[in-house]
Amino acid sequence: MRRRDKEITSREEIDSIIRAADVCRLAFARDNEAYLVPVSFGYDGGSIFFHTAPRGRKLEFIAANNRVCFELEANVELRANERDACDWTFEFESVIGYGTVSELTSDEEKIGGLNQIMRHYSGREWEISGQAAATTRVWKIEIESLTGKRSSEKPQITQMDADQPD
């Protein structure tokens, strides 16, 4: 990472960003073509899970090259400067990772992967039918590397700051 001052090295902080993210963006490549797609996801601390329909473009890219790059972000906030157009920016925390995609094929694995996704969004495990598992393709990204970035430190508000009039 070029800006080491923005790098997040703590795995605990990186995991926290992943758990706070709403969307995972997957980047695929084949031949001389790239494909980026947002997906809902689950995370178990070592792998990311996502699902697809039985057919589609993602599957074509996975078949050609099962290596992926992925991105997640959390705590995104626009910081506007009403006097200087060149001083608008975003505060954010993000994670970029690389890994290898494999398909979960048994109903037990697929239900486990789908529950990782549901747990991410709902905080609980669900009863997922064998029929749902049979008609859904579920995938696991075995994470090989992760890097985190924080755009800037969010200012800490002290009691003295809070007492000052605007």
Give residue spans per PLM region.
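A short mixed-secondary-structure module that forms the rim of ligand-binding clefts
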Residues: G42-L78
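Short Pro/Gly-enriched beta-strand edge/turn motifs at strand-loop
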Residues: A20-C24, Y121-R124
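A short, structured loop/turn motif at beta-sheet edges
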Residues: I62-A64, L104-E108, D163
